[in-house]
Design a protein with these regions (language model features):
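Conserved NTP phosphate-binding and transfer environment spanning the P-loop NTPase/kinase superfamily
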Residues: 18-21, 29, 34-35, 40-62, ...
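Post-Walker A helix-loop "phosphate-sensing" segment adjacent to the P-loop in P-loop NTPases
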Residues: 146-158
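Conserved nucleotide-sensing/catalytic segment adjacent to the nucleotide-binding pocket
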Residues: 79-86, 158-160, 165-215
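Extended hydrophobic secondary-structure segments that form protein cores and membrane-embedded regions
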Residues: 126-132, 158-162, 261
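Glycine-rich phosphate-binding loop used to anchor ATP phosphates in small-molecule kinases
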Residues: 109, 117, 121, 190-256, ...
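Glycine-rich phosphate-binding P-loop
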Residues: 129-145
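Extreme N-terminal, non-catalytic leader segments
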Residues: 30, 46-126
Length: 353
């Protein structure tokens, strides 16, 4: 991974041409330990295999490109323009891998059915996407949803974000943690676990609450999930396992329900830059809506004042959450996408089974 001014924990990995050999121990980052376990002899065993972009792109095989330029335009965000090359070299190999994993899981279900002598209810394959604010989780989720749904067997792919499982603002205000919105304690984790438990039990319909970024709160209505083949769950802290402060650690974790997990990784300085770009764009667009929770930052502040506020939000909320909760969970991901300053994925880490 990049070093120098790039502030993030370092990934220790095994090169693709030496996947079963030890790699030299690397210095620990001040943010978190390197991946793998350090044996007594000072070397490191890594659970991840590292791929350069070119190496990963070759794993596409003969997977056809099923997205048009118009399709792609509708999927990426204003801050993150994803090129067709990015889709072909990064996301097509990933969709191929996921398709193989889903097929293998379905075969395992058939074997179990044969053993039990009776068919079981179809259980969705759950893919989790984690990472920092402004890291590109939503764009990755939408692109994967579109690619997976276009496979020859046309699986049904649903997308749910954990924003809907935030406590309503009234609850956050009552508990005095409105300033901690996005931190683990601001989520109704029990409700999220119940939702995933129902999904994985094969329930016909499972309902999730709806969150509005315009009003910055939970709104009336429900998102109904009806037994998809694949469910993509996108959120900041989905890979975390620790309990919140003052609470007993849960016996069941959100990640217990995942079949595959992806972490979007980037330098903290780049993440901050992307966040401020997004803040500026929203100030010029959505924040101008009188119904917007952040309307005051579009009309009641100068540009300099608003951007200073954005930098303060990053430093006191988003960066703290990244260092304390989000980045430490990275090593639990099955696959890590390492982004450069221009949002291009430069390297990929895949956990060995």
């Amino acid at each position: 991974m990049r070093t120098g001014t790039c502030r993030r924990a370092r990934i220790v990995s095994v090169p693709t041409d030496a996947a079963h050999f030890r790699t030299p121990a690397l210095p620990h980052s001040p943010l978190s330990d390197p991946f793998g376990r350090a044996p007594d002899d000072g070397s490191v065993f890594s659970p991840h295999i590292e791929f350069s972009r070119a190496e990963w792109a070759r794993l596409r095989g003969s997977t056809p490109l099923t997205l048009s330029h118009d399709d792609l335009e509708a999927l990426h965000s204003a801050e993150e323009h994803v090129s067709m090359d990015e889709v072909m070299e990064v996301y097509l190999p990933l969709s191929r891998l996921l398709n193989l994993y889903v097929a293998a899981t379905q075969q395992l279900f058939r074997v179990t059915d044969t053993f039990l002598g009776s068919p079981a209810a179809k259980v969705p394959y759950v893919v989790a996407i984690a990472g920092s604010v402004a890291g590109g989780k939503s764009t990755t989720a939408r692109i994967l949803q579109a690619l997976l749904a276009r496979w020859p067997d046309h699986p049904k792919v649903d997308l749910v974000t954990t924003d809907g499982f935030l406590f309503p603002n009234a609850v956050l205000e009552e508990r005095g943690i409105m300033h901690r919105k996005g931190f683990p304690e601001s989520y109704d984790v029990r409700r999220l676990i119940r939702f995933l438990a129902e999904v994985k039990s094969g329930s016909e319909e499972v309902r999730a609450p709806v969150y509005s970024h315009l009003v910055y709160d939970i709104i009336p209505g429900e998102l109904v999930v009806r037994r998809p083949d694949i469910l993509i769950l996108e959120g900041l802290n989905v890979l975390q396992t620790g309990g919140t402060a003052g609470e007993r650690p849960p016996r069941v974790f959100v990640s217990d329900f995942f079949d595959f997990s992806i972490y979007i990784d980037a330098c903290e300085a780049d993440l901050e830059g992307w966040y401020l770009q997004r803040f500026q764009r929203l100030r010029e667009t959505a924040f101008r809506d009188p119904e917007s929770f952040f309307h005051q930052y579009a009309v009641g502040m100068s540009e300099q004042e608003a951007m200073e506020f954005g930098r303060q939000v990053w430093a006191t909320i988003n960066a703290v959450n990244l260092r304390e909760n989000i980045e430490p969970s990275r090593e639990r991901a099955r696959l890590i996408l390492d982004k450069a300053k221009d949002h291009r994925v430069e390297r990929v880490w895949l956990r060995k089974l």
